[in-house]
Design a protein with these regions (language model features):
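Intrinsic disorder at enzyme termini
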Residues: 179-188, 195-198, 230, 253-324
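C-terminal catalytic lobe of FAD-dependent flavoproteins
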Residues: 2-6, 10-53, 59-239, 243, ...
């Protein structure tokens, strides 16, 4: 909406609805459990590979630069979830996550994210005198492909290409590079491979060193720039119970041993990765999770001093709050 305003377009009106969900340590149920009532906080439990997701909240927000889960939101989700599935009272949660739903808002409509439409609209802006600008807004994950198709067709027509988009019938090409993101694949791969020297670097998700090597090799010419966050996006590293507390150090050490890293950049990558994971861990820090967090802090800060590691320009990383 801000970008459309910069171009002089005032017809795009969005409602920003922040949603928070929490992730369990283990799978609670193999089917979706939805509470039969009007949509509200904590009314759906969804299986996601080896974990379950409990959500979600809905809060209208204005500032998109300060989006993070809060303890109050987590407490509310747990309380509502217990009423639906009593087992949740004894479930360990390892992470909270927040995102923003950009919902279409009709002029004069009530600013309630629960009531707003999940549909999408494609604006060509020609009525506003713009022939080189388009906006696709609204929608949800299940409609993203269709949104891209309609937008692609519009842009293609403007460029003189009348051939329709085929993403609805032609599958995207697959490849081995994405296999490491599948829950359980790395463990099956490691067991089948039977290589004693192939060390497990992430014990929670059983990601072996060979998987890290394969991921790095898929970035030819940019191996030294492959951060831990980039590796985590392409694998299950940091997704387990420890949330990167131990595997971050093992993966970094392995990359130093392989001479992929040969400067303090690897340490800064480790620091940034741990800090990013901590943002989602802090709101669910209670019970048996606390001793593990204390151990991680002692390891990362007291022993290794990652929180005091300066950037290239000598700037110290921010401290306090949720951004170590």
């Amino acid at each position: 909406m801000r970008v459309a305003r910069l171009a002089g377009c005032t017809g795009v009106n969005l409602l920003y609805s922040k949603g928070t969900l929490i992730i369990s340590n283990a799978l609670i149920g193999r089917r979706v459990i939805n509470r039969l009532r009007r949509p509200g906080d904590g009314d759906i439990l969804v299986p996601g590979g080896t974990v379950s997701l409990l959500g979600t909240t809905s809060q209208t927000v204005q500032n998109l630069d300060e989006i993070h889960p809060t303890v109050a939101e987590v407490d509310r989700l747990v309380a509502e979830g217990i009423a639906m599935v009593p087992q949740i009272a004894h479930t360990r949660f390892i992470r909270a996550f927040s995102g923003v739903r950009p919902l279409l808002m009709a002029a004069g409509a009530d600013a309630d994210g629960r009531k707003a439409s999940r549909g999408f609209s494609l604006f060509d802006h020609q009525s506003e005198g713009l022939a080189n600008f388009a906006t696709v807004a609204g929608g949800k994950l299940t409609t993203f492909r269709l949104m891209a198709e309609k937008t692609g067709d519009l842009v293609a027509r403007r460029l003189g290409n009348s051939e329709p988009c085929k993403s609805g019938t032609a599958p995207l090409p697959s490849g081995d590079a994405i296999r490491w993101t599948e829950p359980g694949f790395a463990a099956r791969y490691w067991v089948a491979r039977r290589q004693p020297g192939d060390l497990i670097l992430c014990e929670c998700e059983m990601v072996p060193a060979s998987a890290i090597d394969a991921i790095v090799e898929n970035a030819p010419g940019a191996q030294s720039q492959m951060s831990l966050n980039a590796i985590a996006v392409r694998s299950r590293v940091g997704k387990g119970t420890c949330q990167g507390a131990f595997c971050s150090l093992r993966v970094s050490s392995h990359l130093y041993d392989r001479q992929v890293y040969d400067s303090p950049l690897g340490l800064r990558n480790t620091r940034d990765f741990v800090a990013q994971r901590f943002k989602g861990v802090a709101p669910v820090a209670w019970g048996e999770h606390l001793p593990q967090l204390e151990l991680a802090e002692a390891l990362h800060c007291a022993l290794l001093g990652l929180d005091q590691l300066a950037d290239d320009g000598g700037r110290q990383p921010p401290t306090g709050g949720q951004d170590p």
